[in-house]
Amino acid sequence: MSEVIKIANCSGFYGDNLSIAKKMVEGGPIDVLTGDYLAELTMTILYNQKMKRGENLGYVGTFLKQFRDVAKLCNDQKIKIVSNAGGLNPASMAAEVENIIKELNLDLKVAYIDGDDLMPRLDELSSSGEKLKNIDKNNDLFSYEKKPLTANAYLGAWGIKEALDNGADVVICPRVTDAAVVIGPAAWKFNWSRNDYDQLAGALAAGHIIECGAQATGGNYSFFKEVPTFKDIGYPIAEINQDGSFIITKHPNTGGLVSVGTVTAQLLYEIGSPAYVNPDVISHFDTLKIEQEAEDRVFVSGCRGSSPPKDHKVCINLAGGFRNGTELLLTGLDIEEKAKLITETIFDSVGGKEQFDKVDIQLHRTDKENPESNEQAQAFLRIDVMSQNPDLVGRLFSAKIIELALANFPGWTGRSGVVPSGPYIEYWPALVDSKFIKEKVHFDGKTMEVIPTSQLDFEEVYYQKEPAEVKQITENPDTEIFFGDIFGTRSGDKGGCANLGVWSKNCLLYTSDAADDVRS
C-alpha cells in the first residue's frame, strides 16, 4: 500500500450530478470513492418515501444508478466505495447493491452500518432521563407538542474502519457525520488508534472540505472570477498522509479551481466555532496551515485534535404542522396603504389572525421612485400562515384570497407557486449521551458492535491553542472599495440553523479597521 490514500467525493447532496461518480473513477487514480447525500431535511424526504412507497425503501435510490456505472471499474481497480446513501434503510440499500453485483458477476463484498435510528428508542431514552433538548432553543423534546418523524444520531468513522478492516469493498452507511466517510478510510489505511487525535483531526478537516463536492473546487465561491472555467467542473480529491496532513486537488483537465481561497471558504462552511466537533475527535481548524503547493493542489497541515465529546449529535425532524400563503405584486403609488388594505381584508375574510399558530407578513419595497419599467414599479407583499389544523391553511384559505382579485386594491397581480403550501417540517438538533449509541456493522453474516471512543478508557486530551501573532499594518488614507473585493464569505446551514463564515484575502487585512468592523 502506498503512503497516501486518495479519497474522491462524487456527491455533495441528494440531487447532485449523477455523472460525477463515473468521472471520478475514470479521471485518474483514486483509492476510495465517497458520496454525501444526507442533508438534515433529506431524512424527511426518505421518511415520506418509506411511508408512501414501502417500508423496504427510505434510501437514496439514485446512488444505485451511480453504483451500477462504476461497479466494474471499482472492482477492477480495487477502489473502495463508502457512502451514506443508506439513509433510513441501509440494510435494504445494501441488498440492492448486492443484487447489482450479482447481476454484473463481480467480486465485491458489501457491509452496512446501522444504530443511528433512535425513533424506536425514544421511550427508553426518555425513561433514562435523556431530554434531547433543542441545542438552539433549550426546549425538552419530550414536553414538546409536535411529533418526531425521524431521529438519527450522527455516527462516526469507526464502524467504517471496522467494515474495511474485515474486507468490505462497499460500505453503506446511514446517518453518519459528513466527514466520517473520509475519516474511516484514512483510519483504515494507516491503522490509526482511537486516540491518534491529531491525525484524525486532519482527516476530519479533509472530509469537511470535500464533503460538499464542488464547493471546494470553485462552486459558490465569493471570488468566482478567479475560476478559469465552470465547464465540466472537477470534484475534490483529498490525498491524505499518515500524519493527517493532506492535499486537496481535482482530476486534471477539468474545470473549477483548487486554491487557498476555495479551501478556506469550505473550511468555514457550517461551523460555529474553530473547534469543530465530531464523535471521533474535535478538530481545531485554527491550527491549520494552508499553502498553495502547485496549480490546483493545496497542502493543508498542522491540524491539532482533542478528545471527542461524551455525547452524539442527533438530527430530529418533527411534523411541524401545515402552511399556506400568497405573494402579491403591488404597483404604483400608495404601496404601504395597498399592503395594509389587502392584509386586513384577507384576515377579516378568513376569521382573523389569532386562529393561526404563526403569521408572517413581509412587504418588500423593491419598487423605485421613478420606474423605467413595470418591474421597477413593483413591490411585493408576502403572507405566510401556519397551523396544526390543515383545514385552516388549506384550499379554503387560498380561495378566500383569490376571490378578492376583483374586489380590492388596484392592479391586483398574484404570483403562483412562490409560497410553499402543505405540511412542513421542524428541525430539532439535540444531543444524546454516547453511552446510548449502539452502532453495529453487518458484514459477511457477522454483526460487530462499535463502541464510541468517549465510552472507552482513553485519557482526555484537549489542545490548548497558543495565540497567533498577526503583524500589524500601517494604514494609508482611506480608499472606498467594496467589502467583497477583500473579504470572502461562505454560508452554511444545518436544517434551520445557518452560519456565515468570513475570511480576508490575507492575514494583514485581518488587522485592518475593516476587519474590526466585521468582528463588531
Please annotate each region the language model reported:
Residues S2, L41-N56, L118-K146:
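Gly-rich Lys/Arg/Thr-decorated short loops/hinges at beta-loop-alpha junctions or inter-strand turns
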Residues S2-K22:
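N-terminal amphipathic/basic leader segments beginning at the initiator methionine
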Residues E103-L118, I183-F224:
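Catalytic or ion-translocation cores adjacent to nucleophile or general acid/base/metal-coordination motifs
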Residues D107-V110, A216-K231, P274-Q292, S349-H364, ...:
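Flexible, glycine/charged-enriched surface loops at secondary-structure junctions
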Residues I210-E293:
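A conserved active-site cap/scaffold subdomain adjacent to cofactor or substrate pockets
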Residues D296-D360, F380-D384, D391-L396, G496-W503:
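C-terminal catalytic subdomain
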Residues L392-D493, A498:
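C-terminal amphipathic alpha-helical interaction region
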Residues Y510, A514-R519:
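Single conserved hydrophobic/aromatic residue that forms the stacking wall/gate
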